[in-house]
């Protein structure tokens, strides 16, 4: 986007001229330029009737949410008051309307009269009394020029009622802006209000429509806009997810866009306090555009209004994202009790992660989502289904149909169920199936999703969970829990930075690199400072920086070798007064996710004796799987240090892993409690210990088997410890199963063309081709996973097809065969 060479200076922070003073002749007021700063304006006179100010004053509030009725729509109450005021004046008798317009109309008695507006000889003594006073007579003389009112409104005699009402709407907006200029404390904002005030006055005078002209340009100011970029981000990052999870991300994106459209930006003065000087001029241009085209028109609807996310792009988003993200997350955290339970988890758990991933694409150097020709053809079943992403009526309003994503081409969630089923044997499970038959079809360990969702609502509902406040960390909380919470609240930030010669790194990055050099030098005293400085500022090295309160408190310096398939970790440190807070673990987790994104799945590092413990906790091992030929001569060797390796799993969301495990444990605990509540029988206590018995087998405890407990001792002994041996065994077994005559229905995934509703009935589809791919990718780390998938192949077939079908007969034959082979290979009990 081509930006103006300098920020516009709308007009000086002078007061507007009195409402009855002469106004300039032109209708389309050019957007103010710096040259206008030398032209003072007269002191204002009282407004005819005070009205609501434009949505959300920005002078003292800064960036954040206004104090309107709806916390997500700053200024909504001002907008309502303005609408009510306009409805009042439009309902006045025509004589009263002409009187109000006469106040803004020049006298036409003769060419020598310079009166720019009729002054009532009997002005109202109190605010809003002008509506209660009787209409002035057209013959009533002006207090200033002593010409009758008729000479001021003669041009309105043959004007339609609709045009009169349009002009009256601008009158109310002028009154609003007049009050805003008085109330506003910020100089830049006051200047824009004053400029718009003059523009609307001239439009009333000349009966034209307002047009903002000058160096600001006209919308849209950037392409692609913010909305398109965010939707590209969802497609780019989440198209591989299941439809339900992908729809969740889509709804989060729409919620973010909606909040951004009603968010109040910080003033240029506030922006200047936290940013480097070269960014301020560009931000001031965008801020002025935002006021003129987006913010003020929310309540002054005489001005054309545009959505922030439709007319701005990456430039503005880069300027505001960090502070907006922090304030938005803090707002939702404070108002979490206002959220409906099913949305609380969505916002408090998934939204922070969503914003973190979006931040990487906003500030990343080569993100494809901002390319004008971004295309990512969706695979089968990856199209997003636009739905109103309402979170709560008290927090985020429902989406307008005019926003992107609500086209007629959207998929219907119920469309698949209405298609006629082609002729064939496959059909749903008969309704008359007995309970015992249904139990037999289930794969061991399956839990109904309805039950899991119910438990999730319980453990995320503060009212349903007794005990201490969840925001207080327990003694056995995960190491990175504190850091994760601080990141969600915007207290800490993570940025991948590095020195650059072409183009030259900006000032903020250079300051952070100096801070990193100081942290590494202080925490690694045995490492020469010159050596640290050389690597930190080397353009080939990057650093994941941990930022708190605008300063660097830690980081991991690394060098990527994409052609060799690994990254070397060079330095890793957190400043001493910020340690033992989980920052080191969270740093490493962010680094892992960054490398998964760039398809590098191995870390190598030389750890000294003090760092070995830390790296072991982060999943590093002294067992090096990367061939020596791939790293020899590439990485730096240190005397007395130990080479360690960490292999990354691309399926693991590392920054949320401990939180996910915690949630899984809570779910299991609640499910166990529900299971225990279903067991009505109460057994007497054990008396054997009174007789001197010190220990008994667990299986001898009365009622233990009824709870679902099973002895695990025998199964543990059969687990193959050697991964290569397990892989070979399972590979041979799967090959025998695939060659069985009855395996033909299960060789490949079921095609939708053959069974349109299959994936609605079967929640966890599996087939022998998928199992082969999983085996090849070393998914089956235990034989239990392999056996479970085999069982699910059979269970899915029996659930979807009638018992007497050919498919079920094949399933039964194959089941007997593979159980025989499993027993023969010693993989299950005989």
Curated annotation (Swiss-Prot):
Its main location: nucleus. It holds the Pfam family PCAF_N. It is found in: Nucleus; Chromosome; Cytoplasm, Cytoskeleton, Microtubule organizing center, Centrosome. Residues 398-417 have a biased composition (Low complexity). Acetylated at Lys-542, inhibiting the protein acetyltransferase activity. Deacetylation at Lys-542 by SIRT6 promotes phosphorylation at Ser-302 and Thr-728 and subsequent activation of the protein acetyltransferase activity, leading to acetylation and inactivation of PPARGC1A. The active site is at residue 568. The modification Phosphoserine is found at residue 302. It catalyses: L-lysyl-[histone] + acetyl-CoA = N(6)-acetyl-L-lysyl-[histone] + CoA + H(+); L-lysyl-[protein] + acetyl-CoA = N(6)-acetyl-L-lysyl-[protein] + CoA + H(+); succinyl-CoA + L-lysyl-[protein] = N(6)-succinyl-L-lysyl-[protein] + CoA + H(+); glutaryl-CoA + L-lysyl-[protein] = N(6)-glutaryl-L-lysyl-[protein] + CoA + H(+). Its EC number is 2.3.1.48, 2.3.1.-. The keyword Heme does not apply. There is a cross-link at residues 721, 752, 784 (Glycyl lysine isopeptide (Lys-Gly) (interchain with G-Cter in SUMO2)). Succinyl-CoA binds at residues 572-574, 579-585, 610. In brain, highly expressed in the hippocampal CA1 region (at protein level). Also expressed in the hippocampal subregions CA3 and the dentate gyrus as well as in the cortex and prefrontal cortex. Expressed at low level in the cerebellum. Residues 83-94 have a biased composition (Basic residues). One of its GO terms (cellular component) is transcription factor TFTC complex. SUPFAM superfamilies: Acyl-CoA N-acyltransferases (Nat) (SSF55729), Bromodomain (SSF47370). The keyword DNA-binding does not apply. Acetyl-CoA binds at residues 572-574, 579-585, 610. Residues 721-825 form the Bromo domain. GO terms for molecular function: acetyltransferase activity; chromatin binding; DNA-binding transcription factor binding; histone acetyltransferase activity; histone deacetylase binding; histone glutaryltransferase activity; histone H3 acetyltransferase activity; histone H3K18 acetyltransferase activity. Loop3 is required for substrate specificity and adopts different structural conformations in succinyl-CoA-bound and acetyl-CoA-bound forms. Tyr-638 has an important role in the selective binding of succinyl-CoA over acetyl-CoA. Protein lysine acyltransferase that can act as a acetyltransferase, glutaryltransferase, succinyltransferase or malonyltransferase, depending on the context. Acts as a histone lysine succinyltransferase: catalyzes succinylation of histone H3 on 'Lys-79' (H3K79succ), with a maximum frequency around the transcription start sites of genes. Succinylation of histones gives a specific tag for epigenetic transcription activation. Association with the 2-oxoglutarate dehydrogenase complex, which provides succinyl-CoA, is required for histone succinylation. Belongs to the acetyltransferase family. GCN5 subfamily. This is Histone acetyltransferase KAT2A. It comes from Mus musculus (Mouse). The gene is Kat2a.
């Amino acid at each position: 986007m081509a930006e103006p060479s300098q920020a516009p200076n709308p007009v000086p922070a002078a007061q507007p001229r009195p409402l009855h003073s002469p106004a300039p002749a032109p209708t389309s007021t050019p957007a103010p330029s710096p040259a206008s700063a030398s032209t003072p304006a007269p002191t204002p006179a009282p407004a005819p009737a005070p009205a609501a100010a434009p949505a959300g004053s920005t002078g003292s509030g800064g960036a954040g949410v206004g104090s309107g009725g709806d916390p997500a729509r700053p200024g909504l109450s001002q907008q309502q008051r303005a609408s009510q005021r306009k409805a009042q004046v439009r309902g006045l008798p025509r004589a009263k309307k002409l009187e109000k317009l006469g106040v803004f109309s020049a006298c036409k008695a003769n060419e020598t009269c310079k009166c720019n507006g009729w002054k009532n000889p009997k002005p109202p003594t109190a605010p809003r009394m002008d509506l209660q006073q009787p209409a002035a007579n057209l013959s009533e003389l002006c207090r200033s020029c002593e010409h009758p009112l008729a000479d001021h409104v003669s041009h309105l005699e043959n004007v339609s009622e609709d045009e009169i009402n349009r002009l009256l709407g601008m009158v109310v907006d002028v009154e609003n802006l007049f009050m805003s200029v008085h109330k506003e404390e910020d100089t830049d904002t006051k200047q824009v209000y004053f400029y718009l005030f003059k523009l609307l006055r001239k439009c009333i005078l000349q009966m034209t429509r307002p047009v903002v002209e000058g160096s600001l340009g006209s919308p849209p100011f950037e392409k692609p806009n913010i909305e398109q970029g965010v939707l590209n981000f969802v497609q780019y990052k989440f198209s591989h997810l299941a439809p339900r999870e992908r729809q969740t991300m889509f709804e989060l994106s729409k919620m973010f866009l909606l909040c951004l459209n009603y968010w109040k930006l910080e003033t240029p003065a506030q922006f200047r306090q936290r940013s480097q000087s070269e960014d301020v001029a560009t931000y001031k241009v965008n801020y002025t555009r935002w006021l003129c085209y987006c913010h003020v028109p929310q309540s002054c609807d005489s001005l054309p209004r545009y959505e922030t996310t439709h007319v701005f792009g990456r430039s503005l988003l880069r300027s505001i994202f960090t502070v907006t993200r922090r304030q938005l997350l803090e707002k939702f955290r404070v108002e979490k009790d206002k959220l409906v339970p099913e949305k609380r988890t969505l916002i408090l758990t998934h939204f922070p992660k969503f914003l973190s991933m979006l931040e990487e694409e906003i500030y990343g150097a080569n993100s494809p989502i901002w390319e004008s020709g971004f295309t990512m053809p969706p695979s089968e079943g990856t199209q997003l289904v636009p739905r109103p992403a309402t979170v709560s009526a008290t927090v985020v309003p429902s989406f307008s149909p005019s926003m992107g994503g609500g086209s007629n081409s959207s998929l219907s969630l119920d469309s698949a169920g209405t298609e006629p089923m082609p002729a064939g044997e496959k059909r749903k499970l008969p309704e008359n199936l007995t309970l015992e038959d249904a139990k037999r079809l289930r794969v061991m360990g399956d839990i109904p999703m309805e039950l899991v969702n119910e438990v999730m609502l319980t453990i995320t509902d503060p009212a349903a969970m007794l005990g201490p406040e969840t925001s207080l960390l327990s003694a056995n909380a995960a190491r990175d829990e504190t850091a994760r919470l601080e990141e969600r609240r915007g207290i800490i930030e993570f940025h991948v930075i590095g020195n650059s010669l072409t183009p030259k790194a900006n000032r903020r990055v250079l300051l952070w690199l100096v801070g990193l050099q100081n942290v590494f030098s202080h925490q690694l005293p045995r490492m020469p400072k010159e050596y640290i400085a050389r690597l930190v500022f080397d353009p080939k090295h990057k650093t994941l920086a941990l930022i708190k309160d605008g300063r660097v408190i830690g980081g991991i310096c690394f060098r990527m070798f994409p052609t060799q398939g690994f990254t070397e970790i060079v330095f890793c440190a957190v400043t001493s007064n910020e340690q033992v807070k989980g920052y080191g673990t969270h740093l490493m987790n962010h680094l892992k996710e960054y490398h998964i994104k760039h398809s590098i799945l191995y870390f190598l590092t030389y750890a000294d004796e003090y760092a070995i413990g830390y790296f072991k906790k982060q999943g590093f091992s002294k067992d090096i799987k990367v061939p020596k030929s791939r790293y020899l001569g590439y990485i730096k060797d240190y005397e007395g240090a130990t080479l360690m390796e960490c292999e990354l799993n691309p399926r693991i969301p590392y920054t949320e892993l401990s939180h996910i495990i915690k949630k899984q444990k809570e779910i299991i605990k609640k499910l166990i409690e529900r299971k225990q509540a279903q067991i009505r029988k109460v057994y007497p206590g054990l008396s054997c210990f009174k007789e001197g018995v010190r220990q008994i087998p667990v299986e001898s405890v009365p009622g233990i088997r009824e709870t679902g407990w099973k002895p695990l001792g025998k199964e543990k002994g059969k687990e193959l410890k050697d991964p290569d041996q397990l892989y070979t065994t399972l590979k041979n077994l799967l090959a025998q199963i695939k060659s069985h005559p009855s395996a033909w229905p299960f060789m490949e995934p079921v095609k939708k063309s053959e069974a349109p509703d299959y994936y609605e009935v079967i929640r966890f589809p599996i087939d022998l081709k998928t199992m082969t791919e999983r085996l090849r990718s070393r998914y089956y780390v235990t034989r239990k996973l392999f056996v479970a998938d085999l069982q699910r192949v059979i269970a899915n077939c029996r659930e979807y097809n009638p018992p007497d079908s050919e498919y079920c007969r094949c399933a039964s034959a194959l089941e007997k065969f593979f159980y025989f082979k499993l027993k023969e290979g010693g993989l299950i009990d005989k």
